[in-house]
Amino acid sequence: MATALVSPLTSQLNHEAVCSKFVLPKSPFMSGSKLFSSNMPCSTVPRRTRRSHCFASAKDMSFDHIPKQFRGDNLKDGVMQNFKNVPQYFYGLNSAQMDMFMTEDSPVRRQAEKVTEESISSRNNYLNNGGIWSMSGMNAADARRYSMSVQMYRGGGGGGGSERPRTAPPDLPSLLLDARICYLGMPIVPAVTELLVAQFMWLDYDNPTKPIYLYINSPGTQNEKMETVGSETEAYAIADTISYCKSDVYTINCGMAFGQAAMLLSLGKKGYRAVQPHSSTKLYLPKVNRSSGAAIDMWIKAKELDANTEYYIELLAKGTGKSKEQINEDIKRPKYLQAQAAIDYGIADKIADSQDSSFEKRDYDGTLAQRAMRPGGGSPAAPAGLR
């Protein structure tokens, strides 16, 4: 009986004694040195209540460090506004990659400062990064062993004193056009016709009182295997443009003038059709490649070939002064002519001479200086009538 009355009390006292005597070292994270509070039994403290003493609720946390545009209802508008302010080249980058652009001393910013209008110009690229001259991992001596072009850039093969010229090359097509020179140097295909016709029209508009020089080095519409690679009608378009221009057209055979190219040579102004001493001229009839198809298609091609042949003979007769019957008889088979023979046949008038007064001498230094004075260093704006 006595034991039953004393046991609960003793156990309770022993439990409180243990709780009160179990002391922890002092810590800045705890207010007291005791593990359990003396006024509340350890077993009666709920788990949730004890956890609430360690962590603050979400309502008690401060939002001062969050910008106002990202709080509550303004979150969506703030995010969209921030998104619009970010450059497009930041899209898809992580924070580390963005730092490369946003840091003042970033490698991207340092590289961007070096990129100027002058540094990306063609002149700067020619002077500092021209071809094999800038081969990575090689010095000038090593690069010179690999290419003769480096020696030519430096002014020849001998000596180390000669340096590569520090001036950019001229714009050759523009210089030739300024000198009123047109060059036919490939088979007569649509792209060639388009360029030549455009040049003739511009030069005739620019100054119809000055002559136009047409240099020819073309196999015409056929290659060395007598295969058709060009178009006969393209040559007739050039011929009609020559007749249309008010400017006189001086023609020069500077290599070869075969087929339709020989016809264009003969259409130059009489007395100003020249051939180089070792140039060659050849006359041949138009032809079509082997083809197959319906009978009506073959008949149409045959009629087209007859028409092209008639035009060719007619234009040759106009240029040479011979009758169409004689020309038709002469070119039943290809007719090959050297320089003097072409003159005798009436296709040309003389052998080209560097002292010929008909070829105007040009001051290229003055031309370059004149072009540099133009706005933007380029060609002048087109007249209002051509826009």
From Swiss-Prot:
Residues 355-387 are annotated as: Disordered. CDD domains: S14_ClpP_2. The lineage of its organism: Eukaryota, Viridiplantae, Streptophyta, Embryophyta, Tracheophyta. This is ATP-dependent Clp protease proteolytic subunit-related protein 1, chloroplastic. Its main location: plastid. One of its GO terms (molecular function) is ATP-dependent peptidase activity. Keywords: Chloroplast, Plastid, Transit peptide. GO terms for biological process: chloroplast organization; proteolysis; RNA processing; rRNA processing. Disruption phenotype: Variegated leaf phenotype. Slow-growth phenotype, with chlorotic leaves during early development.
